From Swiss-Prot:
Its cofactor is Mg(2+). It catalyses: dUTP + H2O = dUMP + diphosphate + H(+). Substrate binds at residues 68-70, 81, 85-87, 95. It comes from Caldanaerobacter subterraneus subsp. tengcongensis (strain DSM 15242 / JCM 11007 / NBRC 100824 / MB4). Its EC number is 3.6.1.23. This is Deoxyuridine 5'-triphosphate nucleotidohydrolase. Belongs to the dUTPase family.
Length: 148
C-alpha cells in the first residue's frame, strides 16, 4: 500500500536534503539537523534541534521519531522522548529533544543525520469499560516474569 507524505521545508532549511531512506529495506527515513553552523551538547545536556521540515500525513497515520543507533552507540546521543509522535493533524516544524548521555561533548553540525522517522498506520479502537478482563496464563505477571 502506498501513501503520500507531503513535506514542506522551513525557509531556513531550503539547502538541506529531504528525509531519505538510506537502504532498500530501511523502515525509517533519516532526518537532518537544521542548526546554524553547529551546536555542541555537553554530557547530560538537552538541546532542542530543529529539522527544518513540516509534514502532512494522511488521516489515521502517525510519524514516529526515533534515535539513530550509531549516534547512541558511538556518542551517547539519543532522543529524550522516544519514540516521539507526530500526529496527522500537526503542521508545525518537527523538532527533536536531543540528550547527550555520553561522557564527552558532542557537536551536531548543520545537515547531519540526527534521527529517523517511521510512518505507521494508527488504529483508534472503540473504548468500553468492563468489570472483568478475560483470563490468560500470564495474567498480571509483568516486569521480569520470564526471567532476566
Amino acid at each position: 500500500m502506498s501513501i503520500v507524505l507531503k513535506i514542506k521545508r522551513t525557509e531556513d532549511a531550503k539547502d538541506l536534503p529531504l528525509p531519505a531512506y538510506m537502504s532498500e529495506g530501511a523502515a525509517g527515513m533519516d532526518l537532518y539537523a537544521n542548526v546554524k553552523g553547529e551546536v555542541t551538547i555537553n554530557p547530560g545536556e538537552v538541546e532542542l534541534i530543529p529539522t527544518g521540515i513540516q509534514i502532512e500525513l494522511p488521516p489515521n497515520y502517525e510519524a514516529q521519531i526515533r534515535p539513530r543507533s550509531g549516534l547512541a552507540l558511538n556518542y551517547g546521543i539519543t532522543l529524550l522522548n522516544t519514540p516521539g509522535t507526530v500526529d496527522s493533524d500537526y503542521r508545525g516544524e518537527i523538532k527533536l529533544i536531543v540528550i547527550n548521555l555520553g561522557k564527552q561533548p558532542v557537536t551536531i553540525k548543520r545537515g547531519q543525520r540526527i534521527a529517523q522517522m517511521v510512518i505507521n498506520q494508527v488504529v483508534r479502537p472503540k473504548i468500553i469499560e468492563v468489570e472483568e478482563l478475560s483470563e490468560t496464563e500470564r495474567m498480571d505477571r509483568g516486569f521480569g516474569h520470564t526471567g532476566v
